[in-house]
Amino acid sequence: MNRLQQRQPFLENLLVGVNSTFHQMQKLSINTCCQNLQKILDLLILHRTIHSPAFRLDRMQLRQMQMLACLWIHQRNHDHLATLDTIKWISP
């Protein structure tokens, strides 16, 4: 199996995890969703350091994930101060 074929399931699982966190927003508080999202990002960083290059996400991809999360939160949260606090919490 080549690197692209190995990487595809990893990226698909990542998207499923992030998507499920986003959809929990109706049931959970924004802080709980952000904590779950941060766990996913932490796991990505861990994978980036211990797995073969086929499974590594580069810094730009991790930053894109954070940016998408922040945009998603901004679109769904009408309290701008809470949104800014959340974005600061997610983004290192």
Curated annotation (Swiss-Prot):
InterPro entries in the record: Rotavirus_NSP6 (IPR006950)
Signal peptide: none
Keyword match ATP-binding: no
Keywords for this protein: Host cytoplasm, Host mitochondrion
Entry GO terms, CC: host cell mitochondrion
Coiled-coil stretches: none
Subcellular location: Host cytoplasm; Host mitochondrion
Keyword Nucleotide-binding: no
Family: Belongs to the rotavirus A NSP6 family.
Subunit structure: Interacts with NSP2 and NSP5.
Family annotation (HAMAP family): ROTA_NSP6
Protein name stated in the entry: Non-structural protein 6
Originating organism: Rotavirus A (strain RVA/Human/Indonesia/B37/XXXX/G8P[X])
